[in-house]
Amino acid sequence: MFYGFDIGGSKIALGVYNAHRQLIWQRRVATPKDDYAQLLAAIDTLTQQADGFCGVRGSVGIGVPGLPIADDGTIFSANIPAARGRTLRADLSARLGREVRIDNDANCFALSEAWDDEFMQYPVVLGMILGTGVGGGLIVDGKPVTGRNYVVGELGHMRLPVDALRVLGRDIPLLPCGCGKYGCIEGYLSGNGFSWLWHYFYQKTHSAPEIIRRYYEGDTDALAHTERYRELLAVCLGNILTLLDPHLVVLGGGLSNFDALYDGLSERVSSHLLPVARPPRFERARHGDAGGMRGAAFLHLKF
């Protein structure tokens, strides 16, 4: 059995999956805010409950917001104060008496999609999140690629490509990013970026859902705005795909539900790739809110 924990700022969700990758049991509890001992105890209790339900000791995988440090599993996450700076992986492995694997929630999202029954045919899968921020994960042969510093897939912190100036204009401000740099694509491609660009070009203040509603109502500014955003997405994907060359790109996050983004996306991207390169398949994420715990559980699967 495979146990997947999705630990967020407000809740801990546990899903138990069988050998066929089917969800057979789940629980949810509140995340202890500032008490590390309570956090360990909550995970321990849920694990024991799952063991009791299954009649066997399952494997444990955990997805967290933030970046686990590759060397020792120390957690750096603003959303889980109780775990910040703690060696969660080592402490839980000792407490539970089994190997615990931890990865960030974006990698777990990508892993969940890569293990979809249909998507398993693709050796290299890129999960890209277009939500409050921009992030993602790279899956190769059923395993997340993490790199030296666990920053593989931090797509939002790539800088605007030169071709973006053609789309947005040479006077576009290089927005400051929370990472301390300027001009990161997250500032323009995220849901907040979608709204910021709307305000920048049209001096109107609306949320992304409101702009999308206007698009479907035929608002001319919303139509033009969506066209500009689609071209910007294609430009940014051109750099990412040239570097990673995935077979499949799965889009998640709130903006991934905007059907218009997929219109002609392959053709748009093709013009930003090498002449010999074919675009990957683009799909919307299929596993929704369950992706975090599902992907965490699958950290123990073998391709």
From Swiss-Prot:
GO BP term (any one): N-acetylglucosamine metabolic process
Keywords: ATP-binding, Carbohydrate metabolism, Kinase, Metal-binding, Nucleotide-binding, Transferase, Zinc
Signal peptide: none
InterPro entries: ATPase_NBD, N-acetyl-D-glucosamine_kinase, ROK, ROK_cs
Task of the protein: Catalyzes the phosphorylation of N-acetyl-D-glucosamine (GlcNAc) derived from cell-wall degradation, yielding GlcNAc-6-P.
UniProt-recorded name of the protein: N-acetyl-D-glucosamine kinase
HAMAP family: GlcNAc_kinase
Record-annotated membrane-spanning stretches: none
Binding site for ATP: 4-11, 133-140
Positions annotated to bind Zn(2+): 157, 177, 179, 184
E.C. code: 2.7.1.59
Catalysis: reaction(s): N-acetyl-D-glucosamine + ATP = N-acetyl-D-glucosamine 6-phosphate + ADP + H(+)
Top-level taxonomy: Bacteria, Pseudomonadati, Pseudomonadota, Gammaproteobacteria, Enterobacterales
GO MF assignments: ATP binding; N-acetylglucosamine kinase activity; zinc ion binding
Family: Belongs to the ROK (NagC/XylR) family. NagK subfamily.
